[in-house]
């Protein structure tokens, strides 16, 4: 994170009282565990009932050197807004729960939210062997033990391939789904 070149991702950390002037703090998350040794990639945060913050992120682990396999898993850390501790049983969601044909290399960007029924849910981007994007859903009663629920939506329309950074929320009586599609093919003014 301290260079112009791609390298192991961290979660930066800054605070502000006015949203104009910012104070930079040490990184909130750094790649310092076996399951995230090659990067702590994007995710989301939620405030727990005890007031603590829970960060859910993608941990990257590479095996076999530069041209080996990459594993992407979903991990959590809990903190007070300044300091965060990674959960001792990370990763909380790994490739073993993926349906057959979905990629363990493209399984990232968890978005966590609490539903009206009090259950925590998250959506995670993935894709299959044919590079068709999927958004997977998981549920948890406590944010620490997660259960695979199914595929929320599948990209059968050719709207990019891998769907990254999904968001799923309720707004004005409707569920809204957002994502960042990778590898969009040019079509008219869309690229």
Q: Which ranges hold each PLM region?
A:
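Beta-rich carbohydrate-recognition and catalytic domains
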Residues: 1-109, 113-163, 170-191
